[in-house]
UniProtKB/Swiss-Prot annotation:
Function: Catalyzes a trans-dehydration via an enolate intermediate.
Catalytic site positions: Y23, H100
NCBIfam families given in the database record: aroQ, PRK05395.1-1, PRK05395.1-2, PRK05395.1-3, PRK05395.1-4
Catalytic activity as recorded in UniProt: 3-dehydroquinate = 3-dehydroshikimate + H2O
Annotated keywords: Amino-acid biosynthesis, Aromatic amino acid biosynthesis, Lyase
Site label Transition state stabilizer, positions: R18
Protein name: 3-dehydroquinate dehydratase
């Protein structure tokens, strides 16, 4: 069975209440339940992890090296600031898809720079919560071809 890790960064625990005009009304728990169901239907084990703390995300990536085949990451604000998450992803050698609910390239200038994009196998951005299912499809397709 393929194991995929979903990582959500800071403030994504506030989905459903934080700026619903940008991020929608679904909670992170709703998104995780829906995505886990889709993964299970495809015989994929999806592990979900969220943290507001950069070091915890780095630790989770490092702990996953032997058990996870692919990572989906919505690093939130850490997308634009975290060299340590970038380095952990590179060091893990686990293929990853960067995802964002909003189109980060059509927002404030500081959100247009990602420290992850050039190392990701792909990026999904701007499709609302559908970005999660699109990213899952992308990583499954990539890993299926890779094997």
């Amino acid at each position: 069975m393929m194991n995929i890790l979903l990582i959500n960064g800071p403030n994504l625990n506030l989905l459903g209440t934080r700026e619903p005009e940008i991020y929608g009304n679904k909670t992170l728990s709703d998104i995780e339940k829906d995505l886990t169901k889709v993964a299970k239907e495809k015989s994929i084990n999806l592990e979900c992890f969220q943290s507001n703390h950069e070091g915890e995300i780095v630790d989770k990536i490092q702990e996953s090296v032997k058990s996870i085949q692919g990572i989906l990451i919505n690093a939130g604000a850490f997308t634009h600031t975290s060299i340590s998450i970038r380095d952990a992803l590179i060091g893990s050698k686990i293929p990853f898809v960067e995802l964002h609910i909003s189109n980060i390239f059509s927002r404030e200038d500081f959100r247009k720079e990602s420290f992850l994009t050039d190392k990701a196998i792909g990026i999904i951005s701007g499709f609302g919560i559908s970005s999660y299912s699109l990213a899952l499809e992308g990583i499954i397709g990539y890993l299926s071809i890779k094997d």
